[in-house]
Design a protein with these regions (language model features):
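Active-site beta->alpha loop and helix N-cap motifs at the rims of alpha/beta catalytic domains
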Residues: 1-7, 11-118
Length: 118
């Protein structure tokens, strides 16, 4: 079995709450240079819920461009809005993300059928 190792990436913010891309790049380099096969950007550990839609697009686009095939990029594309989730997922794949990961609906009671349909 050929296992792959992925690291969920924390999102680094500047004092003004913008994304600190210099820190992000340093973190990408660190994990990829130390045996990790790929990253998960914009997931739960990356505070996806704190990013507006444009910030999420920029975070994904920057990660794909910066990593430039040195590792696998999985983009967290879950949003509270179904259409935003679909659009962000399509955006990530078109930008070159290797895969997307989508969190199911949260903070609301959903049946298994509701989650499946989502």
């Amino acid at each position: 079995m050929n296992s792959k190792y992925f690291c969920p990436i924390l999102t680094s913010f500047n004092d003004d709450s913008t994304i600190n891309y210099d820190d992000m790049h340093s973190l990408y380099d660190h994990v990829l240079e130390n045996g990790i096969d790929g990253i998960l950007v914009g997931g739960s550990a990356g505070e996806f819920y704190a990013l507006d839609y444009n910030e999420a697009e920029q975070l994904i686009s920057d990660a794909v461009q910066y990593i430039n095939h040195r590792g696998i990029v999985i983009a967290g594309t879950g949003r509270m809005n179904r259409l935003e989730t679909i659009n962000l997922s399509n955006f990530a794949l078109k930008k070159g993300a290797d895969a997307v990961i989508i969190v199911g609906p949260y903070y609301s009671a959903c049946s298994q059928e509701d989650v499946f349909n989502y």
